[in-house]
Amino acid sequence: GPAVMFGLGGIFTEALADTAFRIAPLDRQEAKRMIGEISSRKLLGNFRGEAPVDSERLADVLLGLSRLGLERPDIREVDVNPLIATPKGNIVAVDALVVLDEAPSASGAAAGGKGKQKRQAEIRAALDEMANAKSVAVVGATRPEANGFSGMFGCMRNFGYRGRLYPVNPRLQDIDGIRAYPNLSSLPEIADLVIISVPAPRVADILRECAATGHKNIHIFSSGFKETGEEEGIRLQKEIETVAAEGGLRVIGPNCMGFYVPKNRMLTWENASTKTGPVSLISQSGGNAQDFSNYLTDVYDIGFAKSISYGNALTLDSTDFLDYLARDRETGIITMYLEGVKDGRLLLEQVKKINRLKPVIIYKSGLTESGARAVSSHTGSLAGGEKIWK
């Protein structure tokens, strides 16, 4: 989400690194606190006979930038430098640089109250249907590989999934005696959840088939999208984003492990515990979701209610899962492993509200230089600076 940074130094701002951050929207009190937080704040007062800078007018500038960031989601960056305080008390922006997004996301615009509440209710219902799916179709299901990996279908079956499981692969008649289907339209019912495990270039066509056959709840396990940082991966992600939006699809992923729900024996990796408990996890990283879940169970004997790995966050993001788990009766503690956040202000507001009912524990990656590189290569997220998180 939009953030506002304030600091002194003109062309030396980056070298001095004397800055304060806030997530928009700001109020006047927050803006004035920003001004007072920088180490060189004494320079803004009666320093060596200079007239003090008018803090109210300076706060006006910060408030204006805050509003601009919220009202114009197509703006990626505004750099006002230098901002000069004149002897008469005026604040003058001498130069400014505005960088626009080529394709602004519709999620950046503020939704109306009723529309937002309706969307949240629909997403909660969809996520509950996914977590408690009575039927799952695995597109790209395969027989166990020579190295022993069972694939998405095998992991679900071996874990003892309690619903109806449909392998979809036009090249197979069956998988270990279970009938395989050539496509989604040949299934005997509309599955509550479709797991897509095919090469990235094929995912868009599978999503089109999902939309055409009424399958709305999707988990894309496949990788090879924007997390690669390559032009083709970015293009493929934009394509599936368009297809998902046009089809009204609710997508977890791509590049993720999806749901782990011990109660329902739902699992997309191998060797997990069936022990249930009060902890739920929201994780961008599938590997960390797996390791964290196994660690808590194996070392501390703490069971899980739900674990959700969501990768590149195509249509559903951390705030959607947080809103869902806040109302989930099986979840008593919410843990989050975050690499990037689309709407930081919404996340903060949610956490403050939910903490009154159940604790929310956040593990934030990408705060160091090496961590930021790892995050970028993994999910393609913008990790965000350490000061913003503080």
Regions found by a protein language model. Name each.
Residues G1-K390:
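Catalytic-core regions of core metabolic enzymes
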